[in-house]
């Protein structure tokens, strides 16, 4: 089996050498042809010796070679399982499989040895997507989107053994009605969030990792008119709005990793960051841009975009709802957009209209369930007398932590009314949650 893998990999590498113009789809098609030829020659040779080989075995062999060329080899079945949420690999022998229902199982070895495991990751990084990525001694970390849509992060050299984590976004095609069905929002929130998008207001979706920020952004994006010209910008393509068939004019933009020596600007040769791409995106005559996740320096052009565009959205990792504005200010000052807290606050109030906070309660370790829901929707009203942002929680947490209407909006009231939003929805002060939050320990997080 390993000989077949290596033969197909060598032929594929020779085919791609010096040619960077093929799309991932073209590379996959070429790889399938090469794999089929290699497997067919192997089966024919065995049959010529008189060995009986079933057709089903030939297909299984082909699937295994393709998993080696374009997938994660022995890990591929786990990453393809729709019930699996995370796969964690620590060295070739230790595999942890985390299921959406909270189960944790030990998987079979990921490879024969660490070297083979690294080869698998390096191969899929180089052939699996349009913007080639690498995992090397000089570039010991890797972040990428796998062909099946899962997200992969990997490290080596700086860790005792290669580390790989894959994460599945189990809900790709989703709208706000689906979010009501998932009990992540209630009908009141559903109508309000739709109005926010239709009113072209700028939004940050914040929350801890795994709280459903990206899924909610996908759902809110379905309220963007189908024919609107807009962009998504990500370090690794993850939102997938260009793949749903629901948008005629969405442009997915992905950052490009650099390789080799550092240039005069201190960046690896060939690197194109989101920070660099933002100014050019602003010149494409778009109304809005959606950024999958703001982590670092891209916070600066993101707020520049929000200052000049309408209806933009991004996600941000924050542990607590009351820490969102401070986290934004911290990033703006760290990356040079402001030299004081007051300067950061001015940037925030000029650019941002709403903060939506997504929370998570995970009681699986004590025999319960995992719950993801919106807990806050906060309007950024303006700058207060103390040179701090004035905000008001249009929705705030009820006794169980889930969002309930609190007050009517101030700054954005007219814009929301122009979308047809009925303010009477906000008089449902108990909310309209379709199911109780079935927690073992009462109260919010």
Q: Model-flagged regions — what are they?
A:
Residues 203, 219-349, 359:
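Switch/coupling sub-region of P-loop NTPases
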Residues 206:
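Residues at the beta-strand->loop junction immediately N-terminal to the Walker
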Residues 209:
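The conserved Walker
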Residues 368-445:
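NTP-binding/hydrolysis catalytic cores, primarily Walker-type P-loop NTPases
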Residues 90, 98-199, 244:
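P-loop NTP-binding catalytic core
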Residues 345-385:
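Phosphate-binding/switch region of NTP-binding enzymes
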Residues 1-135:
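N-terminal accessory targeting/assembly segments
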Residues 213:
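Conserved lysine of the Walker
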């Amino acid at each position: 089996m390993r000989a077949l893998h290596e033969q197909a990999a060598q032929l594929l590498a020779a085919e791609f050498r010096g040619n960077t113009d093929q799309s991932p789809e073209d590379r996959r098609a070429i790889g399938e042809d090469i794999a089929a030829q290699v497997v067919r020659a192997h089966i024919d040779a065995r049959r010529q010796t008189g060995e009986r080989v079933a057709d089903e075995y030939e297909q299984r062999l082909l699937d295994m070679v393709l998993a080696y060329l374009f997938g994660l080899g022995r890990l591929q079945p786990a990453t393809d399982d729709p019930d699996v949420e995370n796969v964690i690999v620590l060295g070739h022998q230790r595999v942890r499989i985390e299921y959406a229902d909270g189960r944790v199982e030990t998987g079979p070895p990921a490879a024969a040895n660490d070297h083979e495991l690294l080869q698998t990751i390096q191969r899929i990084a180089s052939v699996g997507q349009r913007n080639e990525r690498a995992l090397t001694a000089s570039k010991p970390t890797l972040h990428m989107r796998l062909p099946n849509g899962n997200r992969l992060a990997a490290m080596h050299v700086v860790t005792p053994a290669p580390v790989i984590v894959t994460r599945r976004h189990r809900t790709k095609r989703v709208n706000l009605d689906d979010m009501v069905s998932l009990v992540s929002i209630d009908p009141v929130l559903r109508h309000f969030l739709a109005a926010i998008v239709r009113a072209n207001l700028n939004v940050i979706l914040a929350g801890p990792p795994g709280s459903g920020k990206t899924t909610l952004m996908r759902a809110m994006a379905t309220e963007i008119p189908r024919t609107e010209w807009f962009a998504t910008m990500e370090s690794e393509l993850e939102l997938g709005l260009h793949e749903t068939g629901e948008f005629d004019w969405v442009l997915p933009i992905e950052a490009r990793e650099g390789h080799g020596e550092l240039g005069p600007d201190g960046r690896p040769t060939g690197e194109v960051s989101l920070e660099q791409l933002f100014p050019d995106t602003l010149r494409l005559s778009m109304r809005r841009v959606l950024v999958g996740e703001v982590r670092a320096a891209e916070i600066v052009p993101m707020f520049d975009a929000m200052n000049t565009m309408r209806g933009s959205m991004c996600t941000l990792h924050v542990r607590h709802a009351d820490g969102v504005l401070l986290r934004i200010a911290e990033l703006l000052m760290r990356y040079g957009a402001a030299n004081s807290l007051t300067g950061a606050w001015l940037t925030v109030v000029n650019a941002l209209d709403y903060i939506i906070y997504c929370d998570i309660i995970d009681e699986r370790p004590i025999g319960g369930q995992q719950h993801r829901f919106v807990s806050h929707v906060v309007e950024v009203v303006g700058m207060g007398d103390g040179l701090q942002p004035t905000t008001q929680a249009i929705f705030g947490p009820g006794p169980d932590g889930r969002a309930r209407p609190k007050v009517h909006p101030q700054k954005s009231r007219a814009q929301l009314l122009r979308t047809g939003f009925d303010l009477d929805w906000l008089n449902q002060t108990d909310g309209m949650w379709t199911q109780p939050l079935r927690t073992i320990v009462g109260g919010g997080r």
